[in-house]
Amino acid sequence: MVIGIDHGYGNMKTATRCFPSGVARYDKEPIFQNNLLVYNGMYYQIGEEHKEFCAEKTQDEDYYVLTLAAIARELDGKGMNQAKVHIAAGLPLTWVATQKEDFQKYLLQNESVDFIFRNKEYHVEFAGADIYPQGFAAAFYRLQDFKGINMLVDIDRKSTRLN
């Protein structure tokens, strides 16, 4: 199963789900358990705030944990709790050349993973990950219509980028 994930600073987005890119980590089980993800003996509250800008999305485990939450939300919407998943993710165009390989390794740091999200157990095997320039998918099927010089604008929660 291919799952496309937009790892935004404001929101994580998939084909059918969108949620804030916030992660709060706890050593002990928190009292409030809305959107609680349990992974590797740690507790993560998902979506409580937005992720601060960082030039390297691999600098901490937040985007990995957010990826697990995004996959769980997609699987849950299909009535599933296990799957072999191929991730399709994006990076800003100017970062693809320098960060593509590291981001791919980051997303594939485990061959498989077991975790709990919203009190439901999940088992995910990773079949691979492809990294694309953000926004490219929106324009891909219309490329034949473009003439001359064209620009792609990526409008996010707090930023706008011209590609």
Question: What do the PLM-derived regions correspond to, one by one?
Answer:
Residues V153-R157:
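Active-site-proximal alpha-helical scaffolds that flank and shape metal-associated catalytic sites
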Residues M1-L152:
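Nucleotide/phosphate-binding catalytic cleft detector across ATP-hydrolyzing
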